Amino acid sequence: MSNTQHLGTKFIHAGAHPDPSTGAIMTPIYQTSTYVQSAPGVHQGYEYARSQNPTRFALEEAFAVIENGKFGLAFASGVAATDAVMRLLVPGDEVVAAHDMYGGSFRLFSKVHEKMGIKFIYVDTSNPDNVIGAITAKTKLIWVETPTNPLMNITDIEAISVIGKKHNCIVCVDNTFASPYLQNPLDQGATIVMHSATKYLGGHSDVIQGCLVMNDEALRDQLYFIQKSTGAVPGPQDCFLVLRGIKTLHVRMQRHCENGEKVAAYLRQHPKVARVYWCGFTDHPNHDIAEKQMRGFGGMMSFTLKDDSIAAAIKVLSSTKIFSLAESLGGVESLINHPASMTHASIPREQRIANGLADGLIRLSVGIEDAEDIIADLAQAIG
């Protein structure tokens, strides 16, 4: 598909090919574990569903298209996709990673891959000098989230990619919070893009999935081998759901962005709110970088109350009626979350506080309901 097409057209048609036998416009769900061969080793390109599945292949093509990449790979979850990238490394290798990343990524790094001899150095990647200062001869990977979860810090993808190339490091960007509608890290020089497709790509809170997109064929072959060998693949039903979700990504993201701007502005003027973390504010520390590399600022944000007690935060978290108290994000419905006890509970409190993630921080995934109803819900919950 041509990269000159507008985003909506690209998302609707990504990975879509009419079924040759029936003409079905939607990719069929190939619910099979194996494929018949006419003779040993003689087949139609499909041997076993862990290695090949037509529904998954269509989705992987779509992933590549929407991220302006050449190769896409689908995984059973975002964490599985992250794990695959880590398996490119060998004992003794080092990783420079964002210090305020998603708690699940931190858990994977600190509790699984550190035991395998990988060293992780956590820095504030929003300042490229911090990354440069952390790189050694053993550094093989730079792991970036932008915007970060949940503090919405912004990292200059282009600047970090230049650093990575200079030091022969893979640069992998977790693009989950932005989605391909708002940001395409490969265009900024990144080596790999990772998504938890559970979030905005699926968009309906009904599937768990992850993906990787890259341009380098040799790297794709390595990651495909890992995908196949570890078996971290999604089933065809899940692939179908994400394929369907991608078709409406652009219209959903437009509403997420519109609602996000309204909610952020409301919270900022609320007398009981101390601070709002949203990268669309012109006084956000790296707003100029966000404006340069993003098409909009999305519906993810966090805030703290002037009463910074956990009890005050819990009162808000337990009082919403439209916002559902739940982990995850990026669905059509609005979600409210307490990172300290939910998504980031695996990070030691001292480290979490040092990174700026307060006990009373509240994270919002602003959905696509009517903005007036979303704001009214926050108003009654905050009081």
Question: Where are each of the predicted segments found?
Answer:
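Conserved PLP-enzyme active-site core in the AAT-like
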Residues: 2, 71-272, 277, 288
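Glycine-rich phosphate/pyrophosphate-binding loop
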Residues: 29-30, 38-58, 62, 335-360
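Conserved N-terminal alpha-helix of the aminotransferase class I/II PLP-enzyme fold
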Residues: 34-83, 87-88, 104-111
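PLP-dependent enzyme catalytic core of the Aspartate aminotransferase-like
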Residues: 110, 119-121, 137, 307, ...
